[in-house]
Amino acid sequence: NPELSLDLVYNPGGAFLPPPQASLEQDYREMLGREFGITFSSLLAITNLPVNRFAHSLRRDGQLEDYQQLLVDNFNAGTVSALMCRHLINIDWEGRVYDCDFNQMLELPLGGGKNRHLWDLNPQGLEGKDIATERHCFGCTAGAGSSCSGELA
């Protein structure tokens, strides 16, 4: 059905940054179309952040510090204005609020303070708020950046 959209998500299969989203999309369009007759709307390239299972895997393989340094070394200031944590919040099933879904996984509350619930927030009070950050945040700013909608820069 041409009215439906199909978006593919590319996550690197290891401790490296994704290639440029546009070239990946072109390569996948050509190969999937030629080999399987598959067409899709867009491809989103997302960086693996070193949290939970991926961090455990990196630690187990002795790659955690090297991968973290790769993210730091590839910091791109051009991604900062488009970071999701600057424009959105994440809410868990109990109403607790976080700066992003990765901070939720790490149990880092909104702004790095005490746990807050959605019903206790004033939306206007969120403008210019502090954002809880740790080393995993470099994953969203490395290279072309990363978000739920793919590259940022």
Positions of the model-derived regions?
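Weak global preference for isoleucine
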Residues: 38, 46, 89-91, 131
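Radical SAM enzyme [4Fe-4S]-AdoMet core and its adjacent flexible, acidic
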Residues: 1-84
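C-terminal accessory regions of radical SAM enzymes
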Residues: 72-104
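Aromatic-residue detector
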Residues: 24-28, 53-55, 91-94, 98, ...
